[in-house]
Amino acid sequence: MQEGNYIENDKNTYTLHTNDDAAKFETYTLQDTVKKNVSSKEPVIKNKHHRPYINMIENGDTAIIANRHIYFKKVVNFRDVGGLKTTQGKTVKWGKIYRSDNLSQLRTGEFDKFNDLQIKTVFDLRTPQEIEGKEDHLPPNVSYVHAPSVLDHGDLLSGMRSKVLNGEISDEESIQIMAEFYRGIVADNVPALKQLLQTILNSDAPVLYHCSAGKDRTGITTALILSVLKVDRQTIINEYLLSDYYRRQKVERMLTKAKIAKVIKPRLGVGVIQNFMSVNERYLNEAFNYIDSNYGGMDAFIKNQLGISDAQRKQIIEKLTY
């Protein structure tokens, strides 16, 4: 398969090709050290908005690769869900499903970069209270769909704030609270996920969905979508845990502020704050276990709760994997 962008190698050359006339790449002509050179020296792309998808061709086999995390200055957890292997030996397509934190601080100057992703629909999973004053800032050609998935999320957080400040919640209790929250998301998220999958099924254009931090509701939404595509649970968990990596600087800043505030509020639970701001394999497993215990497993949940028939699921898999 030699279409789009791809790398071609023979005994003497290692060439990166592109179908974009605005992008200029280097050609490496080394033999034994070629892999080292390619990995340590990024190809020069003149068009900074262009996101290349690269077909790596070796011995007749092709693997499509791309950068998972997509950098925007104030949107820290924006990433592509593609590139994951399924239990059927397929791969989730790059550039079809995107997840992120809220887009209220997406800059107008970054609209070209956003539009380069060809996203036509954005699903906002936040509650109206969360959105107020933090509305998504989107290019005018992008459709916005408000699909709140957890109706009481704002009340949950506001109710916890005073307890955290006064040290009324232990670290273990905060983990239990998050686990219960994830169990609740499973049921509350069904209408939003149904709408999201219907759009994916009927449109060839990429979609994006997000909540506030892009980790909990967005994480479960991603886990369910990948389950529909028959990605195994450990791979789903690994993808979910990436939120801690991409949000690490933001979380570190918040924890630094919390440690300073602890001087005034000595009972403030810094560990509790960290548990609320982080992802945890235990949280997502609570959601999986809830589905297994209450709905007869993931396949039954997909069919009976999400309303996706075997034929529809096959169609979704064909559309979103290769």
Q: For the regions a protein language model found, what residue spans apply to each?
A:
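Cys-dependent protein tyrosine phosphatase-like superfamily
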Residues: 1-207, 221-322
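Ser/Thr-glycine-rich phosphate-binding loops at phosphate-binding pockets of nucleotides
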Residues: 213, 217-218
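Hydrophobic anchor at the beta1->P-loop junction of P-loop NTPases
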Residues: 209-211
